[in-house]
């Protein structure tokens, strides 16, 4: 029998406000998501240490 792929996949989250600010560097987080429960792209509010505030981080491909 063939082994099935797991439902959990690893994704990378990138800050959306950081690009607009023009500051050097980038804020990224890696996390896991369940493919069956959240099929669309993940959006979380995470801390950006460069901007020193909580910002929206979206899943990148």
From Swiss-Prot:
SUPFAM superfamilies: Zn-binding ribosomal proteins
GO cellular component labels: cytoplasm; ribonucleoprotein complex; ribosome
Source taxon at top rank: Bacteria
InterPro entries: Ribosomal_bL33, Ribosomal_bL33_sf, Ribosomal_zn-bd
GO MF terms held by the record: structural constituent of ribosome
Cystine pairs: none
GO BP, sorted A to Z: translation
Keywords carried by this UniProt record: Ribonucleoprotein, Ribosomal protein
Recorded family membership: Belongs to the bacterial ribosomal protein bL33 family.
Protein name: Large ribosomal subunit protein bL33
């Amino acid at each position: 029998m063939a082994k099935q792929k797991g439902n959990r996949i690893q994704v990378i989250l990138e800050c959306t406000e950081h690009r607009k600010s023009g500051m050097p560097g980038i804020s990224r987080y890696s996390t896991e998501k369940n493919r069956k429960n959240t099929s669309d792209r993940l959006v979380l509010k995470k801390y950006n240490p460069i901007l020193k505030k909580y910002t929206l981080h979206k899943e990148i491909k």
